[in-house]
From Swiss-Prot:
Keywords: DNA-binding. It comes from Methanocaldococcus jannaschii (strain ATCC 43067 / DSM 2661 / JAL-1 / JCM 10045 / NBRC 100440). HAMAP family: dsDNA_bind. GO terms for molecular function: DNA binding. The keyword Metal-binding does not apply. This is DNA-binding protein MJ0691. GO terms for cellular component: cytosol. The keyword Acyltransferase does not apply. Belongs to the PDCD5 family.
Length: 109
């Protein structure tokens, strides 16, 4: 193997990795766009605004709520479109289920 052949193989490997990475990014973008489209159908504009405000404060919680909303809608267990009031009630139920109990203990010496 000469130096040129090694360089060519290395270049091909890098190009292949780059192409795979671009495909993954495109797939993620496509999935995100589909999720947004579903949420647009599921939620009223006011409820979507509320979800976006939640995303700013707690991104992980917003992601979990989105997944649950989509699953419930696909199972037919949500009124479509979901009003802001119904969305608030759903958020309260989800929050109550996922809320961690925080206990503070003070040890005095």
């Amino acid at each position: 193997m000469d130096v040129e052949e090694i360089k060519r193989k290395k270049l091909l490997e890098l190009q292949k990795k780059l192409a795979e990475q671009q495909q993954q990014e495109e797939a993620l973008l496509e999935a995100e766009m589909q999720k947004r489209a579903l949420l647009r159908k599921i939620l009223t504009p006011e409820a979507r605004e509320r979800l976006e405000r939640i995303r700013l404060a707690r991104p992980e919680f917003a992601e979990a709520v989105e997944v649950q909303l989509i699953q419930l809608a696909q199972l037919g267990r949500l009124p479509i479109p979901l009003s802001d009031e119904d969305f608030k009630a759903l958020l309260e139920r989800i929050s109550a289920l996922t809320k961690r109990k925080r206990e503070i203990k003070i040890v005095r010496k």
